[in-house]
């Protein structure tokens, strides 16, 4: 099994609900280690840059507006098959379609306010982790 790193963001809706610790418990219980973390109020430029891949999609403006609506908790997770494991923990993008017991089923309100972001591939994970963390801010353990 490959040790991977992935990016996770606890979005403004979940931060406002004060469930960061409950979400972190899901990561750690699944064998993922938090190797970097910071709370941050994203600027519009940061959110637009991070989600640039969606720039031409109709939901882009609403997504950016949501991501700058309050602080987010950003973390790099590390572990065996971290990308897939985190995606399984998150559940489907639409919380109404997410399996019971997943983060989105338990903490998300809607497809827009869906509690968490997670990298969708090992390649994107490397890009996303580097977007928010310098190598010196990451401590493998």
Swiss-Prot record:
Protein name: Nucleoside diphosphate kinase
Transmembrane segments: none
UniProt record similarity statement: Belongs to the NDK family.
Location within or outside the cell: Cytoplasm
PANTHER family found in the cross-reference section: NUCLEOSIDE DIPHOSPHATE KINASE (PTHR11349)
Pfam families the record matches: NDK
Catalytic center residues: 117 (pros-phosphohistidine intermediate)
Subunit: Homotetramer.
Task of the protein: Major role in the synthesis of nucleoside triphosphates other than ATP. The ATP gamma phosphate is transferred to the NDP beta phosphate via a ping-pong mechanism, using a phosphorylated active-site intermediate.
Essential cofactor(s): Mg(2+)
Catalysed transformations (reactions): a 2'-deoxyribonucleoside 5'-diphosphate + ATP = a 2'-deoxyribonucleoside 5'-triphosphate + ADP; a ribonucleoside 5'-diphosphate + ATP = a ribonucleoside 5'-triphosphate + ADP
Keywords: ATP-binding, Cytoplasm, Kinase, Magnesium, Metal-binding, Nucleotide metabolism, Nucleotide-binding, Phosphoprotein, Transferase
Gene3D superfamilies, per database record: Nucleoside diphosphate kinase-like domain
Cellular component annotations (GO), alphabetically ordered: cytoplasm
Annotated GO biological process: CTP biosynthetic process; GTP biosynthetic process; UTP biosynthetic process
Positions with a binding annotation for ATP: 11, 59, 87, 93, 104, 114
